A protein has these predicted regions:
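Beta-turn initiation residues at beta-strand->coil junctions
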Residues: 57-59, 93-96, 111-116, 163-166, ...
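Flexible, processing/modification-adjacent segments and terminal tails
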Residues: 24-32, 103-171, 177-181, 189-192, ...
Length: 533
């Protein structure tokens, strides 16, 4: 989870600022790129391929996918439809009976979830999306390349050519010099935690002399994707690349305050806190955690068993420890909080029980409303963003948030100008959790390696995905700066960089408790107002 907070817009011309083929100096990388372009028979912007539509299905599920019964197999049926026009694209993923979509309008990369709630992709996520788009739309061969040595792929010698698209991440292309076939590509090749590796194991013709990669094996889980159909469509227009409208909707009530409960959990380091509230799910009351770090709404077994919902798709979720928990996608008729009702919302239903919770309310609860939480008065108010504007009081700050992952991320700073990009997570009852890469790399220097007297403390974290397989080291930092707010003598623990990337993490409830919160996701903001606590 490597997050950034500065949104990058991509003007259509800039996104297509590919180096012209003519005028390149003769070099091994240029020759290899030209050979691959000849192997493909076309490149992005080729007038003979004004648009391209691909149908993609998995031929092999990821390794480690839980076994399922025959009746569940339809819930895992996956089909991807990808439409390209130059670098503009729309990628529709049908999974069981649900659909999610992502795309690029020429200015904005976006992602829309199963409820058609849409987020703009910010810097890191947008850069990743652009680089993947450049390869998928066959634009990489139009960029200038540098030689990166050679490698053996599937018993064949390849030469590695690195291209670096403007506003994207570097891409290493593994090209067979004998025929120009690309056998592998890696996005962010120098990042040990967040790189994307794709093996290309086959090609097919979609028009005479024009090829597309047709067998792709992705990532560490070895999932295989097959292109079953590839055509040049007609009638493609700009509107094909814009996000869909939300499928769920609110009926807003009287703006009456809704009680919330702040729970206290005693611990060795300090007291952990969380915020809970009651909601009626299809008329049945449940107790929910207010969790900005959750990318949707999740209901646990205690409530799910009473609802008797029909599964739409098999799915799963992970948490702070990177574990995977099986779940199912289900549709709720109503999710009522106070006199406000969210209609037709798709949520995840887990078989995992939690003793004190019936569910977790995250992104889809917050996506289309203004949710104002007053920790002093112990209530929240849900407002219609079409009728209300957020009032930013004196000493309050309206932070722009990066919602690329459907979780609010924004930068925090440490001594020496070091910056991290954590998620601001009201469901995390701890202080600050950062990627262990920031400690191991020496970017962060602790005020003290001890948290309590002479105790060298390690903490084992638990989350929705269970307990961590090993404890996390913890230290105390002099200060952390969150915008104008200074957070002093901060206890910080360090988690798995394969979960948090190089500079990600979580800022938890111990920070949030000093503020009242206004989540204004329709305007991409989180307003924090000091409450004197």
């Amino acid at each position: 989870m490597n997050k950034r907070s500065s949104w990058t817009a991509f003007p259509f011309g800039a996104a297509l600022a590919l180096v012209p083929v003519l005028g390149w100096a003769a070099s091994a990388p240029a020759d290899l790129l030209a050979k691959h372009r000849a192997f493909m028979g076309w490149a992005a912007g080729d007038p003979s391929v004004p648009a391209l539509k691909l149908t993609i299905v998995p031929s092999k599920l990821p390794e480690g996918t839980p076994t399922i019964t025959a009746s569940e197999s339809a819930q895992r049926a996956l089909r991807i439809t990808a439409l390209y026009r130059g670098l503009l694209f729309r990628r529709t993923q049908e999974y069981g009976k649900i659909t999610s979509v992502s795309g690029f309008t020429g200015r904005v990369f976006w992602r829309s979830n199963e409820n058609a709630n849409t987020v703009r992709l910010f810097d890191s996520a947008a850069r990743e999306a652009l680089s993947l788009d450049v390869v998928s739309a066959n634009g990489a061969t139009l960029l200038e390349g540098t030689a990166r040595g050679g490698a053996t792929v599937r018993n064949r010698h390849t030469e590695i050519v690195r291209v670096d698209p403007q506003n994207g991440f570097p891409i290493d292309l593994y090209i067979d010099p004998a025929n120009g076939e690309m056998l592998r590509y890696v996005i962010r090749p120098d990042d040990a935690y967040d790189n994307t590796t794709v093996q290309v194991e086959g090609y097919k013709e979609f028009a005479p002399g024009k090829r597309v990669a047709s067998i792709l094996r992705t990532g560490k889980n070895r999932q295989s994707l097959d292109v079953t159909d590839a055509i040049i469509p007609t009638g493609v227009i700009d509107a094909d690349f814009v996000p869909p409208k939300p499928k769920s909707s609110w009926t807003f009530g009287t703006s009456a305050p809704i009680p919330v409960t702040e729970l206290l959990r005693s611990g060795l380091i300090a007291s952990g806190r969380s915020l809970q509230f009651h909601a009626k799910v299809n008329g049945i009351e449940g107790n929910f955690l207010f969790d900005s770090g959750a990318s949707g709404i999740l209901i646990f077994k205690s409530l799910a068993d009473r609802l008797n919902l029909t599964p739409l798709a098999a799915s799963g979720y992970s948490g702070i420890n990177g574990g995977f928990v099986s779940a199912r996608e289900v549709r709720l008729d109503t999710f009522q909080v106070g006199d406000n009702v969210l209609h037709d919302v798709i949520v995840q239903s887990s078989n995992s029980p939690l003793t004190d919770l019936d569910g977790i309310a995250g992104y889809d609860f917050l996506a289309q409303a203004i949710v104002d939480v007053d920790l002093v008065k112990k209530h929240m108010v849900i407002l219609d963003p079409a009728k209300f504007d957020v009032n930013v009081e004196k000493n309050a700050v309206a932070f722009p948030v990066d919602l690329s992952s459907s979780q609010p991320a924004m930068p925090i700073k440490f001594a020496g100008g070091v910056t991290a990009h954590p998620i601001f997570d009201t469901g995390n009852d701890f202080f600050v959790l950062l990627s262990d890469d920031m400690r191991n790399s020496g970017k962060i220097v602790a005020l003290s390696q001890k948290l309590i007297g002479d105790i060298d403390l390690r903490v084992t974290f638990g989350g929705v995905d269970g307990s961590a397989p090993q404890s996390a080291p913890c230290v105390r930092l002099t200060r952390v700066d969150v915008g104008p707010y200074v957070y002093e003598t901060v206890p910080v623990c360090f988690g798995n960089p394969y979960v948090f990337g190089k500079d990600g993490g979580l800022v938890g409830y111990d920070f949030f408790r000093h503020f009242n919160w206004t989540f204004d996701y329709p305007d991409g903001k989180l307003v924090l107002t000091p409450n004197g606590r």
